[in-house]
Amino acid sequence: MPVPASWPHPPGPFLLLTLLLGLTEVAGEEELQMIQPEKLLLVTVGKTATLHCTVTSLLPVGPVLWFRGVGPGRELIYNQKEGHFPRVTTVSDLTKRNNMDFSIRISSITPADVGTYYCVKFRKGSPENVEFKSGPGTEMALGAKPSAPVVLGPAARTTPEHTVSFTCESHGFSPRDITLKWFKNGNELSDFQTNVDPTGQSVAYSIRSTARVVLDPWDVRSQVICEVAHVTLQGDPLRGTANLSEAIRVPPTLEVTQQPMRVGNQVNVTCQVRKFYPQSLQLTWSENGNVCQRETASTLTENKDGTYNWTSWFLVNISDQRDDVVLTCQVKHDGQLAVSKRLALEVTVHQKDQSSDATPGPASSLTALLLIAVLLGPIYVPWKQKT
């Protein structure tokens, strides 16, 4: 503040002190900062919440008040000089001369207490104090952890190359901000939609997300993971999983082959059912359209990708077979329509000769008896007449 040139004499000590105090107050006002370190404060119903506020200067002279909200409709939360605030106490002693801590505690928190709180500095005035500076505000929100995510897959199985939907739900969290991600075998998915309800203010929120996944033939051992991250969680996010083995059906492939003749008049025919899932499978043999009950043996093996192979052996007696024998291997998998594979039996002349030389059947035995009767008949009759 410059000294007017019209003054005939230098100012006295009292005037200099007044000018110095004025300059100090202006500098203090310019340096004043209202510090509210927490942008978000998560609280629990029934507990006590502490709202921090410190100042960097005691100037200008005047009180510090607490409000919830801004504008004309803001709510007065605490005033040291006036009003009755039974649930609010100060952290420090505000009566101390050099106190710069105006933090408060609010006890018995209820859902109605959520909102943004501001500590505001007023300049002392007459007849009323004038608002001078406000802190940035601290949002108080009810902190509630989300429930463990639950992942649900499709109601029915689907074959590879088709798209299926998985849903993920989590409930009861607060505040509303939450992050949800989808993964398949560790790879993040992008085809999903997420909704958080309700859209307005609430005590607790729920999230629901639906992801679309294209099934691959090797997905029997695959997993989808729903990952939820929230400010109330300490450490890793929450995860829910679903196995694609519950959603996929891999249809089998069939192959019927005729093996070299094993013993005598028997031909071994093999039906190989490959790469199917799930395990439930029914296999039947038919010969020229007639269902056969006999089956020599069968084996079930599991592949590395989780699918299965089934091998069935069927023995055919060719000693009295015609040349037009057709064998059919029919498979009904997981309640689906049956699929089948046919094989026309090939019997060579050599195999027929082997079968006829192997073991005499009823017809050949009867022929031998008739020949013996014809040869021995004339001998038997004279011998009978002599006697």
Curated annotation (Swiss-Prot):
Q: Which GO cellular component does the record give, naming just one?
A: plasma membrane
Q: Which residues lie on this side of the membrane: Extracellular?
A: 29-360
Q: What does this protein do?
A: Probable immunoglobulin-like cell surface receptor. On binding with CD47, mediates cell-cell adhesion. Engagement on T-cells by CD47 on antigen-presenting cells results in enhanced antigen-specific T-cell proliferation and costimulates T-cell activation.
Supply the source organism for this entry. Answer: Homo sapiens (Human)
Tissue distribution:
Detected in liver, and at very low levels in brain, heart, lung, pancreas, kidney, placenta and skeletal muscle. Expressed on CD4+ T-cells, CD8+ T-cells, CD56-bright natural killer (NK) cells, CD20+ cells, and all activated NK cells. Mainly present in the paracortical T-cell area of lymph nodes, with only sparse positive cells in the mantle and in the germinal center of B-cell follicles. In the thymus, primarily expressed in the medulla on mature T-lymphocytes that have undergone thymic selection.
Q: Where is the Ig-like V-type domain?
A: 29-137
- Residues forming the Ig-like C1-type domain are 146-245, 252-340
What is the name of the protein in this document?
A: Signal-regulatory protein gamma
Q: Which cysteines are joined by disulfide bonds?
A: C53-C119, C168-C226, C271-C329
Ranges that cross the membrane: 361-383
Per the record, ranges on the Cytoplasmic side are 384-387
Q: Which residues are glycosylated?
A: N243, N268, N309, N317
**Subunit and interaction comment:** Interacts with CD47.
Signal peptide (residue range): 1-28
Picking any one GO biological process from the record gives: intracellular signal transduction
The record's subcellular location field reads: Membrane
